[in-house]
Amino acid sequence: MADEGRHKDFWSEAFAIQGSVTPLVFPRVLTFGVIAALIWIANELTHELDFHLAVAPYEVAGAVLGLLLVLRTNSGYDRWWEARKLWGGIVNQSRNLAISGLTYGPTDPEWRSNFVRWIATFPHVARCSLRNTRELPEVTKLLGEEEATRIAAAGHMPSYVAMRLSQTLQQAVASGKMDTLAFLQVDKERASLIDHIGGCERIAKTPLPRVYAIKIRRFIFLFLVTLPFALLNKVGWVTPFVTMFVAYPTLALDQMGIELQSPFSQRKLGHLPLDEITQTIEKNVLDLLRVDESLEQK
């Protein structure tokens, strides 16, 4: 509901700087404005040369360019939304794994606490793995510094945590405190976590083909550099401002597509709120543990 309210104020959204691509594209917009100004000055100083072009081709080219930019933005959004769905799966599977472990696992309080804490560790480790960092303060709080150091030293941290979860379940089966059918059900939930992080890694390590960006940006450059020649006879000295007016949405849409392509990078404006998501998972599974402990005491 808080996010819903945040998008209701038209004026605050229209003039927002934080979270906007405007600071990123404004230098480029200004550059095209300067180029247009130089073209207008050259036209004014050199009257014997005809620098003018017809407007009609730019109307067609503008429509084509707009379509390409929308497709580019949609491609970026599809990647962003797929990443969000995968993290939604991690949220749900973490809850399911905690519920299944507490329901079918041993009644030993130490085992249950250890198992749930390893579950709470997984999303933090997955987030850090996707962001290429091995600083694990949340894991230190959950499992202690020694375990956090072991996880940080692992080649693939999410797989290490998933392995420890599987070992914890296997120990319960070996001790006769968990039957095989229950183990298979709970381990199925655990395996799903690896499937989801694998999907996230596929997105993170497979950028859109660079040739796609090169062609679109080359088209943008040619369109905006030559646009002033079509405007000179129409708007005169206002040509630089009209060029900038056209350049802003064009370059902004291009940048939006770039920002949405990397949903896990904190350097991108459109990155997923993984800190909040992982904290939510930790809180949810630890709450389940507390509820279970209170029920055991009754």
Please tell me what each predicted stretch does.
Residues 23-32, 201-233:
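Transmembrane alpha-helical segments and their cytosolic interface motifs
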Residues 80-97, 186-197, 203, 267, ...:
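Intracellular alpha-helical coupling/juxtamembrane segments of multi-pass membrane proteins
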Residues 63, 230-254, 258:
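Pore-lining and gate-forming transmembrane alpha-helices of multi-pass membrane transport proteins
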Residues 1-92, 107, 233-237, 264-268, ...:
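N-terminal juxtamembrane/topogenic regions of multi-pass membrane proteins
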Residues 87-99, 112-130, 274-289, 296-298:
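Alpha-helical membrane-embedding segments
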Residues 98-212:
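Structured inter-helical modules in multipass membrane proteins
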Residues 212, 227-231, 238, 257, ...:
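Long amphipathic all-alpha helical oligomerization modules
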Residues 247-250, 256-275:
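A hydrophobic, small-residue-rich beta->alpha segment in the mid-to-C-terminal subdomain
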